[in-house]
């Protein structure tokens, strides 16, 4: 039987930074909980607390509605990373 991997304990970044409210205008803070394609990452991957995850989801949805953050990112047009260049 294969050994199980041991992962480090996940912690809430927002609780550690003592953030009381996550503002939709602070896009740098929102990018901590978004994937490179612009999707909202789930709690099991980010380690956010329930309260922080709900605030993040609301803030990202508001920022998308106000066009501060894109709904989706087209990775075909981005050739900055070495990973993207290796396939073309």
From Swiss-Prot:
GO function terms (MF aspect): small ribosomal subunit rRNA binding; structural constituent of ribosome
Secretion signal, residue range per the UniProt entry: none
Cellular component GO terms held in the UniProt record: cytosolic small ribosomal subunit
Regions that span the bilayer: none
InterPro entries: Ribosomal_bS18, Ribosomal_bS18_CS, Ribosomal_bS18_sf
UniProt entry keywords in alphabetical sequence: Ribonucleoprotein, Ribosomal protein, RNA-binding, rRNA-binding
Pfam family, one: Ribosomal_S18
GO biological process assignments: translation
Family: Belongs to the bacterial ribosomal protein bS18 family.
Subunit structure: Part of the 30S ribosomal subunit. Forms a tight heterodimer with protein bS6.
Function of the protein: Binds as a heterodimer with protein bS6 to the central domain of the 16S rRNA, where it helps stabilize the platform of the 30S subunit.
Protein name: Small ribosomal subunit protein bS18
Organism name: Aliarcobacter butzleri (strain RM4018)
């Amino acid at each position: 039987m294969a050994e199980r991997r041991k992962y480090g304990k996940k912690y809430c970044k927002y609780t550690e930074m003592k953030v009381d409210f996550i503002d939709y205008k602070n896009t740098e803070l929102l990018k901590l909980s978004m994937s490179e394609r612009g999707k909202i990452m789930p709690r099991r991957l980010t380690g956010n607390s329930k309260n922080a995850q709900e605030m993040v989801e609301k803030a990202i949805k508001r920022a998308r509605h106000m066009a501060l953050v894109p709904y989706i990112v087209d990775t075909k047009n981005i050739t900055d990373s070495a990973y993207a260049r290796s396939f073309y």
